[in-house]
């Protein structure tokens, strides 16, 4: 037990040191004091746009410094409790200390990752699209496994999810789906997950039990809020309505409530059929279009735009971000960071935090 406690303490202290440097705690505290003084000014709202920007920065610094100080304080309390438990030889309290430190270690690691979020949309909700690659039923099944993996990942992070659009495969799985992920920093946590995912396994659809390779792609884009301006001209849009697909039965949609919007200049398409109201589906599809166009613009500002565009359109060997091998051995490996794990079951159940952290750290390092 003592060894486990020391290990958790070491991890937390390492996270705190990285956070101290990443946040530049002393400078951030001075800036927060300055912002608090500015926020108290009676002239604050003379310039509404600047006031909103100032208050967002103030709120962000308060949250970051508050979380950092809380982790420090909780670690101090746990160490004091451990010292008391050792002096009294109280095993029950020692077990509680270990449990508390384990939880604090997880919180510190998550906060450490979130400090790598630097994009203007990283705090926003996001949309996740999954598309099956070539290969029919096998790829359709893999796309449905990926959908579950990301739904579980979102659940682990405390996010809410909403399936906006889904097209089922003929025999099994899905051809495609769009998921709205709702929660603070959802886009920050998901943005590095865009690309092609390769699965190697013994196919449950092959009578001979052959090992098969399947591909599916994911694309992530942020939901646009009032802080980000995206202008779309009506003349650039084509809006189509159609009957929503479904399994039939009592609630089958018998009206043309599903909506598809095409942005003619870019060829970008969004569609929504999650609601029985055509008006609500149109509003959601327009929101998705704004998000896609924003993401396309952000991609144009990066040197890797060609690679990213290919990753979302070409489900092939050359544009993979991650491989999932279930046979003849078990291994999930990120091809960008080389991070890997043999816990394939955990990964497919949504345990993706380490993969995301490694990708964000690599991206942060490449910008220095």
UniProtKB/Swiss-Prot annotation:
Its main location: cytoplasm. GO terms for molecular function: translation release factor activity, codon specific. The keyword Cytoplasm applies. One of its GO terms (cellular component) is cytoplasm. InterPro entries: PCRF (IPR005139), Pep_chain_release_fac_I (IPR000352), Pep_chain_release_fac_I_sf (IPR045853), PrfB (IPR004374). Disulfide bonds: none annotated. It is found in: Cytoplasm. SMART domains: PCRF (SM00937). Methylated by PrmC. Methylation increases the termination efficiency of RF2. The modification N5-methylglutamine is found at residue 250. Keywords: Cytoplasm, Methylation, Protein biosynthesis. Peptide chain release factor 2 directs the termination of translation in response to the peptide chain termination codons UGA and UAA. Belongs to the prokaryotic/mitochondrial release factor family. This is Peptide chain release factor 2. The gene is prfB.
């Amino acid at each position: 037990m003592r060894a486990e406690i020391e290990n958790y303490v070491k991890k937390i202290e390492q996270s705190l040191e990285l956070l101290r440097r990443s946040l530049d705690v002393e400078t951030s505290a001075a800036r927060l004091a300055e912002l608090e003084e500015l926020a108290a000014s009676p002239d604050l709202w003379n310039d509404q746009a600047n006031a909103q920007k100032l208050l967002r920065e103030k709120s962000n610094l308060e949250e970051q410094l508050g979380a950092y100080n809380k982790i420090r304080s909780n670690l101090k309390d746990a160490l004091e409790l451990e010292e008391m438990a050792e002096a009294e030889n109280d095993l029950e309290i020692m077990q509680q200390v270990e449990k508390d430190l384990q939880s604090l270690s997880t919180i510190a690691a998550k906060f450490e990752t979130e400090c790598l979020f630097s994009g203007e949309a990283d705090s926003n909700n996001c949309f996740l699209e999954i598309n099956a690659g070539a290969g029919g039923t096998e790829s359709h099944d893999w796309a449905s496994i990926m959908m579950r993996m990301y739904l579980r990942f979102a659940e682990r992070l405390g996010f809410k999810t909403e399936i906006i659009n889904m097209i089922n495969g003929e025999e099994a799985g899905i051809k495609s789906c769009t998921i709205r992920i709702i929660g603070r920093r959802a886009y920050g946590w998901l943005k590095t997950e865009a690309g092609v995912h390769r699965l190697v396994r013994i196919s449950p659809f092959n009578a001979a039990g052959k090992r098969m390779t399947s591909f599916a792609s994911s694309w992530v884009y942020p939901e646009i809020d009032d802080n980000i301006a995206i202008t779309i001209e009506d003349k650039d849009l084509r809006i189509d309505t159609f009957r929503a697909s479904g399994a039939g039965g009592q609630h089958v949609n018998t009206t043309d409530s599903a909506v598809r919007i095409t942005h003619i200049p870019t060829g970008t398409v969004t569609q929504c059929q999650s609601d029985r109201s055509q008006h609500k589906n149109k509003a959601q599809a327009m929101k998705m279009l704004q998000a896609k166009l924003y993401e396309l613009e952000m991609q144009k500002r990066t040197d890797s735009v060609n690679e990213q565009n290919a990753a979302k359109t070409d489900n092939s060997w050359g544009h993979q971000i991650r491989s999932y091998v279930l046979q003849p051995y078990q291994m999930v490996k990120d091809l960008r960071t080389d991070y890997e794990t043999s816990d394939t079951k955990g990964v497919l159940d949504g345990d993706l935090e380490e993969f995301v952290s490694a990708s964000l750290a690599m991206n942060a390092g490449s910008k220095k």
